[in-house]
């Protein structure tokens, strides 16, 4: 009998084992129907220990009152996760996307760009990130001004 999470299609145990054998902390990205969740976790015998968690709803703490899972929100969640990870003492991590497929220029790639821009070192190729036009929201009706949002993050970092 297979594990329940494998039968339900929730966990790829082969991929999880490879990630855990690396003994690096994991940057976990989960895209939901209405939002995005980013976490930094490390393995523990008693269960994974979550060091930092950021969702699209938590961006209001940084002065961004938008929710969703578009490309810009994913970038900002990744950036915020990087800020929180550095507060927790995390300098390097590996990307954990679960059973999702990684698409070049997609939402997970935008989240990855956000965390690398914040200063956390995650192995990646430079060609996987979204175009700057898409990241700046030129394809959206009401784009977020990313430069202003990142400045808000930096101001809050200096205050803390």
From Swiss-Prot:
Record key words, sorted: Ribonucleoprotein, Ribosomal protein, RNA-binding, rRNA-binding
GO BP terms, alphabetized: ribosomal large subunit assembly; translation
Pfam families in the record: Ribosomal_L5e
Gene from which this protein is expressed: rpl18
One term of GO molecular function: 5S rRNA binding
Name under which the protein is recorded: Large ribosomal subunit protein uL18
InterPro entries in alphabetical order: Rbsml_uL18_euk (IPR005485)
GO cellular component, one term: cytosolic large ribosomal subunit
Function in brief: This is one of the proteins that bind and probably mediate the attachment of the 5S RNA into the large ribosomal subunit, where it forms part of the central protuberance.
Subunit details: Part of the 50S ribosomal subunit. Contacts the 5S and 23S rRNAs.
HAMAP family membership: Ribosomal_uL18_A
Similarity-based family: Belongs to the universal ribosomal protein uL18 family.
Keyword DNA damage set for record: no
């Amino acid at each position: 009998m297979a594990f329940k999470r494998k039968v339900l299609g929730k966990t790829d145990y082969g991929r999880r084992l490879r990630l855990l054998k690396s003994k690096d902390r994991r940057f976990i990205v989960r895209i939901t129907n209405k939002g995005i969740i980013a976490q930094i976790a490390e393995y523990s015998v008693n269960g994974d220990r979550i060091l930092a968690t950021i969702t699209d709803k938590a961006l209001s703490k940084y002065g961004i009152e938008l929710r969703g899972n578009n490309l810009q929100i994913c970038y900002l969640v990744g950036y915020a996760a990087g800020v929180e990870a550095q507060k927790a003492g995390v300098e390097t991590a590996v990307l954990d996307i679960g059973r999702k497929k990684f698409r070049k220029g997609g939402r997970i790639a935008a989240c990855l760009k956000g965390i690398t821009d914040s200063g956390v070192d995650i192995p990646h190729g430079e060609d996987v990130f979204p175009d700057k036009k898409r990241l700046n929201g030129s394809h959206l009706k009401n784009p977020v001004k990313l430069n202003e949002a990142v400045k808000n993050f930096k101001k809050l970092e200096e205050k803390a």
